[in-house]
UniProtKB/Swiss-Prot annotation:
<dbReference type="GO" id="GO:0018759">
    <property type="term" value="F:methenyltetrahydromethanopterin cyclohydrolase activity"/>
</dbReference>
<keyword id="KW-0378">Hydrolase</keyword>
<comment type="similarity">
    <text>Belongs to the MCH family.</text>
</comment>
<protein>
    <recommendedName>
        <fullName>Methenyltetrahydromethanopterin cyclohydrolase</fullName>
        <ecNumber>3.5.4.27</ecNumber>
    </recommendedName>
</protein>
<dbReference type="Pfam" id="PF02289">
    <property type="entry name" value="MCH"/>
</dbReference>
<comment type="function">
    <text>Catalyzes the hydrolysis of methenyl-H(4)MPT(+) to 5-formyl-H(4)MPT.</text>
</comment>
<keyword id="KW-0963">Cytoplasm</keyword>
<dbReference type="GO" id="GO:0005737">
    <property type="term" value="C:cytoplasm"/>
</dbReference>
<dbReference type="GO" id="GO:0046294">
    <property type="term" value="P:formaldehyde catabolic process"/>
</dbReference>
<dbReference type="GO" id="GO:0006730">
    <property type="term" value="P:one-carbon metabolic process"/>
</dbReference>
<keyword id="KW-0554">One-carbon metabolism</keyword>
<dbReference type="InterPro" id="IPR003209">
    <property type="entry name" value="METHMP_CycHdrlase"/>
</dbReference>
<comment type="pathway">
    <text>One-carbon metabolism; formaldehyde degradation; formate from formaldehyde (H(4)MPT route): step 3/5.</text>
</comment>
Length: 136
């Protein structure tokens, strides 16, 4: 998750996209992926720019963009942000579009050998936009 500040001015969003594959942290003197899954899979990505999709209805503060840039080792001008409020059609599509990703993550968490999965598909209903993000 991406967060900054407290109280009424607090910012919080879930993020997805290429930035998650680029983001690293230093732990015990070693650089490693922020995402545990990428660490387990031994996957690393490198780029001069990145993109992130945020499930949120307001523009993130500069501090959040700087945090993403630092973790991804890119200049802040190379961070491309797409905002998809959950209450919008784009937000609903973004959530529904991850149905296969969630299934594969579940298979991984159950220690099913992912190399045995050759192909996959998923379907889910697309909810209509709703002004209340909880109901959306």
């Amino acid at each position: 998750s991406l967060s900054h500040g407290e109280g009424k001015n607090a910012f919080y969003a879930l993020g997805s996209g290429p930035a998650r594959a680029l983001a690293t942290k230093v732990k015990d003197g070693n650089e490693e992926p922020v995402e545990e899954l990428y660490k387990e899979l031994g996957y690393r990505d490198h780029s001069n720019e990145t993109a992130i999709v945020m499930e949120v209805d307001k523009v993130p503060p500069v501090e959040v963009i700087e945090k993403i840039a630092k973790a991804c080792k890119v200049d802040a001008s190379g961070v491309h942000v797409i905002l998809t409020p959950t209450s919008s059609l784009a937000g609903g599509m973004q959530v529904v579009g991850r149905v296969l990703e969630v299934a594969l993550h579940k298979a991984h968490s159950l220690h099913f050998p992912l190399g045995n999965i050759i192909d996959g598909t998923g379907t889910a209903p697309v909810p209509p936009p709703h002004p209340n993000f909880v109901k959306a």
